């Protein structure tokens, strides 16, 4: 490979000796060999290429032919070259960046300087190739065309001299093409390496943080997609302007030589316009910077919308989110329009400036009555057209440089923001696993605080984000002794105060406390996620962590449990059994190879939590940090997991168990009670009970809650539970959870359950794959875009403006030829001696003013058409992208939940980030250049055909080769683009998943390299075609030059000059036109991918609705009736609710119980019509809910979800997004949910910021805010889906009482695992396998010893 070898991490070998020049540049030097017949068979053919193969992209020919013959996939492409891999390049870039930081410090470190060092040798080689190319490009149009035209004027001229000049012209053009291709060959690999190096480095830096406090997922997606591509384009285009000074000096000198001082007028036009372009680029950069900030916000909001879509639908908040996103999009569009106007002006400058320079130069020359001949005039035109290159490349280069500058600044912020040094130390005693001595910790670290403006410090101090942990442990309800923010000094706000305890090897430490008391923060402190202010935190041994909200990534169950570990059959089976997953896995369609949706969407909360626990158990670590892992499972499963997993399997391991289920603390070796971030009590369970302090009171409260109702209600269950033998009890308890017909196989379960899976497992069971066929550009794609841009008339008008602008430039040159011909005839006359007169001289007395005014007017018209074109084109393209954005968003918004279960969020985010960036910025840029170049090619061919009709025969013969090449190229490049598009979505999914699970993983595999090498092939394919096109055009140039030479006086010299000046442009212009056309079509792939959603997304409400079927005050009572109701999540999947016939009276409170996966949450989805019934229906107050609009239905119901959801915004926005309630009402509900004191402590009160995922509040506090949100809705029917699972018993009781009081007279459905939350219900509904097996009053069911409810109750009593 020509250029520097960024294959080596340093100049030293493994022994520390400096590598020789030959060793360092060995791969590059081998590529300099013209032909390498005996090259080694490298995995990637580019590594075996010699100079000719490398420069002409011949190494790619087999791939192009294969793409023509068959469909390309990731597997059929050659593997990535090791020299282009992300690993190799990122390591080298890391070394250079570290050196820069060490030299000048992180703040002064220049990322652009490191980028230059990373690729400077390659860039210099590229510039050398470009200079050679530009010299050849200048010699042909200036020297040779002038000589050829002069030769045609000499009647005594020798033919062989003319032919020799034509051959020389062909040779210079061919050499130009070769060096141009070589420059791009170097460029593409340079750009690829820079892109992968920085993308990988940024990603590695992000995952090195244990928690992200400074960047959102939306910003990460934007940086790793749009910003990394900006760097790719910068590496391609930024070296090109280095050739401009050489080109300008060469052309200026020759123009002065043949034209005289007036040539300086044209040169000065170019010189003046270059700083104008620089200014416009700066302006464009400023608008782009502002737009990127708004784009980040839109992508972040979209990510939040897609992540929380279930709750948004259940609350009917679609309008609120639609308004938010549309408002952001409107702001983004305004900024993009401003950037688009500037960019469009820059793109139009190239043809405009060359026309202005030509017209002004020749007009002034004539006004000064200087001699002007056709050879001189058209040599000057040809020369100025070559100089047009300097203006033509500047928009690309300046745009790329400006965007790269913005991108580098954003990336630098990430690279210099180092993860704070670990405060974790090793305890001196090897038997001590955990040691905290007077440890005080905070979530904010000193560096970030110092860099924060003073006026924001107070707010930032309280709004620091965290990952899956509880912040603000001081804000527990009731908040005794907590100091408000206004009472804080400049010192950092501590969250954990003076924590001291020791845990020995093999012990179980139980941690309890109220919501927000600091339990999760304590685990975060042990993980090193917080900031130590004073004291010591010592940890010994390897860690496993189970977060409070389970993190599940897209894959199958087994992959989630193994998490990259080797599969050990015995260990795996044991882990599955002790985590109570055997039954769940046997019920899944493909066992443990069943595909899981993103974030575990197709699993219940309990299943997600136990898979997360199984991951920890299988990892076989020394220390286990378990954050409330049993809150989401029923009593029987909870007891099994605690006994079999925590007490037995983890025996000998050290376990720190945070729990709200206090009954498990009795089995812990030591218990810590936290309050306000401090250890309130500490000791064994027995010691703490004897002290009769807060802990003892909590335990007594728990027992009181269980037995405060009439004792006979539970005595029967207790007697039944204890009169049987242990074995019988286990068997009976097990019967509850076995599916019908499975009892006889129960004894075999440990054996047969070991596989959990059929031998044939479909590759994609749940998540629909993005087929390579998706994104194929058809006429429908263009039709969709044209309709979105305002229709066919507006589109035709826009294209017509391009025609007028380019036509004005062509007309000016044609008019000049006409003028020169007229002057020639007037001067020489029919009788004149042609050898004695000034051929083509334009005299002052032949009506020059008419010709001159028309000639000048053509320039003015071109300016007018150019400005109008830029305005209309920018408006039209942004209208199209905004219309498509809104249409796709609306379609996705109205899609059913099954769509979101089967479509990865990463794929949807790809559409709204990368694809929208393509539509907003890159498609207009490439389309505008393509249309300009296309009409230039058309006018050139028309003029050539008019001057030399015979050239059409040559064009026809060359067209055959052109179409063969085009067919191979088009098929091949389309296949490559599809592979690139399809491979991009998993990368987005991977980024999103990694950012969400950052508290659990600190490093994850990278897929960037695989996407990047598809990009390399795609771009190399463009150059493969371009080179071969240029060779064909050179043959055409040679033919036209011969015709000019051999035609002598049969055609006027001005016509010959006009045809030669144009044909010399066609050589490079046609291939650029085809390339930009292909790029434009490739960008239209994004339109097609969006069109797929527009055409295929089916709205969730497919039933015809009757207008006015919803009574005004409905529902007035809240009676719910299920009639023969059946439901399945998707077609061809098993029923999850089967033949439900159920009547719930108005005002009743119904507790819904059953083991994990029994259908409890599905009942809620049916009620909200998140899934339409397979058969049967549901009546509420005798109204069939299936004939109501979804908005009417869902606004009348309220849900408090299992996983608390808060949105980015303010506290007020989260409670009341439509602002339909007063502040007083909001404070009232906060008071009733014990959150008033917490919110009052925040500087902005109700307007206080809520960060991404609500992570500046603890999980319990988030749930309390969700309860407050529900209280505001004032519904007659309330669904509590495990609503208090994340709360301690005391807060749970308070909230339950609040709910009971606030929703008096309402129908309340409570889904719960902890039976104490349903004991006071009017009725209990027991679910199993999607069926109702019991529905009665709790006392009635408890008195039946064989009832399923009694057995569940007995299992909990035994705990």
Curated annotation (Swiss-Prot):
Keywords: ATP-binding, Endoplasmic reticulum, Glycoprotein, Membrane, Nucleotide-binding, Repeat, Transmembrane, Transmembrane helix, Transport. Residues 123-403, 795-1082 form the ABC transmembrane type-1 domain. The chain crosses the membrane at residues 125-145, 159-179, 231-251, 256-276, 348-368, 376-396, 791-811, 853-873, 934-954, 1031-1051. It is a multi-pass membrane protein. One of its GO terms (biological process) is transmembrane transport. ATP 1 binds at residues 513-520. The keyword Magnesium does not apply. Residues 451-466 have a biased composition (Basic residues). It is found in: Endoplasmic reticulum membrane. Expressed in testis (at protein level). Widely expressed at low level. Isoform 5 is specifically expressed in brain, testis and breast cancer cells. The keyword tRNA-binding does not apply. GO terms for cellular component: endoplasmic reticulum; endoplasmic reticulum membrane; membrane. Residues 467-701, 1120-1354 form the ABC transporter domain. Coiled coil: none annotated. Glycans are attached at residues 405, 438, 540, 981. ATP 2 binds at residues 1154-1161. Residues 446-491 are annotated as: Disordered. GO terms for molecular function: ABC-type transporter activity; ATP binding; ATP hydrolysis activity; ATPase-coupled transmembrane transporter activity. Gene3D superfamilies: ABC transporter type 1, transmembrane domain (1.20.1560.10), P-loop containing nucleotide triphosphate hydrolases (3.40.50.300). Probable transporter, its substrate specificity is unknown. Belongs to the ABC transporter superfamily. ABCC family. Conjugate transporter (TC 3.A.1.208) subfamily. This is ATP-binding cassette sub-family C member 12. It comes from Homo sapiens. The lineage of its organism: Eukaryota, Metazoa, Chordata, Craniata, Vertebrata. The gene is ABCC12.
């Amino acid at each position: 490979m020509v250029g520097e070898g960024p294959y080596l991490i340093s100049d030293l070998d493994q022994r520390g000796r400096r590598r020789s020049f030959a060793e360092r540049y060995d791969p590059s030097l081998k590529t300099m060999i013209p032909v390498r017949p005996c090259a080694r068979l490298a995995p990637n053919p580019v590594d075996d290429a010699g100079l000719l193969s490398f420069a002409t992209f011949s190494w790619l020919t087999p791939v192009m032919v294969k793409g023509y013959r068959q469909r390309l996939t990731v597997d059929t492409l050659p593997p990535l070259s090791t020299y282009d891999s992300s690993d190799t390049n990122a390591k080298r870039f890391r070394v250079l960046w570290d050196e820069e930081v060490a030299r000048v410090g992180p703040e002064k470190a220049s990322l652009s300087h490191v980028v230059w060092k990373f690729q400077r040798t390659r860039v210099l080689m590229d510039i050398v190739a470009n200079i050679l190319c530009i010299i050849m490009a200048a010699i042909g149009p200036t020297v040779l065309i002038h000589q050829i035209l002069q030769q045609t004027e000499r009647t005594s001229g020798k033919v062989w001299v003319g032919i020799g000049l034509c051959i020389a012209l062909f040779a210079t053009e061919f050499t130009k093409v070769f060096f141009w291709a070589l420059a791009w060959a170097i460029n593409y690999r340079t750009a690829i390496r820079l892109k992968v190096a920085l993308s990988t480095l940024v990603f590695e830096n992000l995952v090195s943080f244990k928690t992200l406090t400074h960047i959102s997922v939306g910003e990460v997606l934007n940086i790793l997609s749009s910003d990394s591509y900006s760097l790719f384009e910068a590496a391609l285009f930024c070296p090109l302007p280095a050739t401009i000074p050489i080109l300008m000096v060469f052309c200026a000198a020759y123009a002065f030589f043949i034209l005289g001082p007036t040539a300086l007028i044209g040169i000065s036009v170019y010189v003046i316009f270059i700083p104008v372009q620089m200014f416009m680029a700066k302006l464009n950069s400023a608008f782009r910077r502002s737009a990127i900030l708004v784009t980040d916000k839109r992508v972040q909001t979209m990510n939040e919308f897609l992540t929380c879509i279930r709750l948004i639908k259940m609350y009917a908040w679609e309008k609120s989110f639609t308004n938010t996103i549309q408002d952001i999009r409107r702001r983004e569009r305004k900024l993009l329009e401003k950037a688009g106007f500037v960019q469009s002006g820059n793109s139009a400058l190239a043809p405009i400036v060359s026309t202005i320079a030509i017209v002004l130069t020749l007009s002034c020359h004539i006004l000064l009555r200087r001699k002007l001949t056709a050879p001189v005039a058209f040599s000057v035109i040809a020369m100025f057209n070559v100089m047009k290159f300097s203006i033509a490349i500047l928009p690309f280069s300046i745009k790329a440089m400006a965007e790269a500058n913005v991108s580098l600044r954003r990336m630098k912020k990430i690279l210099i923001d180092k993860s704070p040094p670990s405060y974790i130390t090793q305890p001196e005693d090897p038997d001590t696993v955990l040691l905290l001595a007077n440890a005080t910790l905070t979530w904010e670290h000193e560096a970030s605080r110092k860099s924060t403006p003073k006026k924001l410090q107070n707010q930032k101090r309280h709004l620091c984000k965290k990952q899956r942990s509880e912040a603000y442990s001081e804000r527990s309800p009731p908040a005794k002794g907590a100091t408000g923010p206004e009472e804080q000094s400049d010192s950092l706000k501590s969250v954990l105060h003076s924590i001291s305890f020791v845990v020995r090897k093999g012990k179980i430490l139980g941690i309890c406390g109220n919501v927000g008391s600091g339990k999760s923060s304590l685990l975060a402190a042990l993980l090193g996620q917080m900031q130590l202010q004073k004291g010591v935190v010592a940890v010994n041994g390897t860690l496993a962590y189970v977060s409070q909200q389970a993190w599940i990534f897209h894959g199958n169950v087994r992959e989630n449990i193994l998490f990259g570990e080797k599969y050990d059959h015995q260990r795996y089976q044991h882990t599955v059994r002790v985590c109570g997953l055997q039954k769940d896995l046997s019920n899944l369609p493909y066992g443990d190879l069943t595909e899981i949706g993103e974030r575990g969407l197709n699993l219940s909360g309990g299943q997600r939590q136990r898979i997360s626990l199984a991951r920890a158990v299988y990892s076989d670590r020394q220390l286990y940090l378990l954050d409330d892992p049993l809150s989401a499972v029923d009593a029987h499963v909870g007891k099994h997991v605690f006994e079999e997993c925590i007490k037995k399997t983890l025996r000998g391991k050290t376990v720190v168990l945070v729990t709200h289920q206090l009954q498990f603390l009795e089995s812990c070796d030591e218990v810590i009670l936290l309050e306000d971030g401090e250890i309130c009590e500490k000791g064994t369970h027995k010691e703490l009970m004897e002290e009769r302090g807060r802990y003892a009171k909590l335990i007594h409260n728990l027992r009181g809650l269980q037995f405060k109702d009439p004792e006979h209600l539970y005595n029967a269950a207790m007697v039944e539970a204890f009169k049987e033998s242990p074995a019988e009890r286990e068997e009976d308890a097990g019967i509850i959870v076995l599916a019908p017909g499975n009892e006889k196989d129960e004894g075999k379960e440990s054996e047969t359950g070991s596989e959990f899976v059929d031998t044939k497992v479909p590759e994609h069971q749940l998540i629909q794959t993005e087929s390579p066929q998706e994104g194929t550009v058809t006429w429908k794609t263009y039709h969709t875009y044209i309709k979105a841009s305002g229709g066919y008339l507006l589109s035709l008008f826009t294209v017509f403006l391009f025609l007028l602008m380019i036509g004005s430039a062509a007309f000016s040159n044609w008019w000049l030829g006409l003028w020169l011909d007229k002057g020639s005839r007037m001067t020489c006359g029919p009788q004149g001696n042609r050898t004695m007169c000034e051929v083509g001289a334009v005299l002052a007395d032949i009506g020059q003013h008419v010709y001159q005014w028309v000639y000048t007017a053509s320039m003015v018209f071109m300016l007018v058409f150019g400005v109008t074109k830029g305005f209309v084109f920018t408006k039209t393209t942004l209208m199209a992208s905004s219309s498509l954005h809104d249409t796709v968003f609306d379609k996705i918004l109205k899609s059913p939940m099954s769509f979101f279960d089967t479509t990865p969020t990463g794929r949807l985010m790809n559409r709204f980030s990368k694809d929208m960036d393509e539509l907003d910025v890159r498609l207009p840029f490439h389309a505008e250049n393509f249309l300009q170049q296309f009409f230039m090619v058309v006018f050139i061919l028309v003029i050539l055909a008019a001057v030399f009709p015979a050239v059409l025969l040559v064009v026809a013969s060359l067209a055959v080769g052109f179409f063969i090449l085009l067919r191979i190229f088009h098929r091949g490049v389309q296949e490559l683009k599809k592979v690139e598009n399809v491979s991009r979505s998993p990368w987005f999914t991977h980024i999103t998943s990694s950012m969400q699970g950052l508290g659990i993983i600190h490093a994850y595999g990278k897929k960037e390299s695989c996407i990047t090498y598809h990009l390399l092939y795609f771009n190399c394919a463009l150059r493969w075609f371009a080179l071969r096109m240029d060779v064909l055009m050179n043959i055409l140039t040679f033919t036209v030059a011969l015709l000019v030479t051999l035609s002598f006086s049969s055609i006027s010299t001005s016509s010959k000059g006009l045809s030669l000046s144009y044909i010399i442009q066609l050589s490079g212009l046609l291939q650029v036109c085809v390339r930009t056309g292909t790029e434009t079509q490739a960008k239209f792939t994004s339109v097609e991918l969006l069109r797929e959603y527009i055409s295929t997304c089916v709205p969730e409400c497919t039933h015809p609705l009757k207008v006015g079927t919803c009574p005004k005050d409905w529902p007035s009572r809240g009676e719910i009736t299920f009639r023969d109701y059946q439901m399945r999540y998707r077609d061809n999947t098993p029923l999850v609710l089967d033949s439900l016939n159920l009547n719930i009276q108005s005002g009743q409170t119904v507790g819904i119980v059953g083991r994990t996966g029994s259908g409890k949450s599905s009942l809620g989805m049916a009620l909200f019509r998140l899934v339409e019934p397979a058969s049967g229906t549901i009546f509420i107050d005798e109204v069939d809910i299936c004939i109501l609009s979804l908005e009417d239905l869902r606004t009348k119901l309220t849900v408090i979800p299992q996983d608390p959801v808060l949105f980015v915004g303010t506290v007020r926005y989260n409670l009341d997004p439509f602002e339909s309630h007063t502040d007083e009402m909001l404070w009232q509900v906060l008071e009733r949910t014990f959150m008033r004191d917490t919110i009052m402590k925040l500087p902005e009160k109700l307007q206080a910021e809520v960060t991404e995922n609500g992570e500046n509040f603890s999980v319990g506090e988030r749930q309390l805010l969700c309860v407050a949100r529900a209280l505001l809705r004032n519904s007659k029917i309330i669904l509590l889906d495990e609503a208090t699972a994340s709360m301690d018993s005391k807060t749970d009781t308070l909230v339950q009482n609040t709910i009971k009081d606030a929703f008096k007279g309402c129908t309340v459905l409570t889904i719960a695992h902890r039976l104490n939350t349903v004991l006071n219900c009017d009725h209990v509904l027991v679910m199993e396998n999607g069926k109702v097996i019991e529905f009665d009053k709790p006392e009635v069911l408890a008195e039946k010893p064989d009832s399923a409810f009694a057995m569940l109750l007995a299992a909990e009593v035994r705990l």
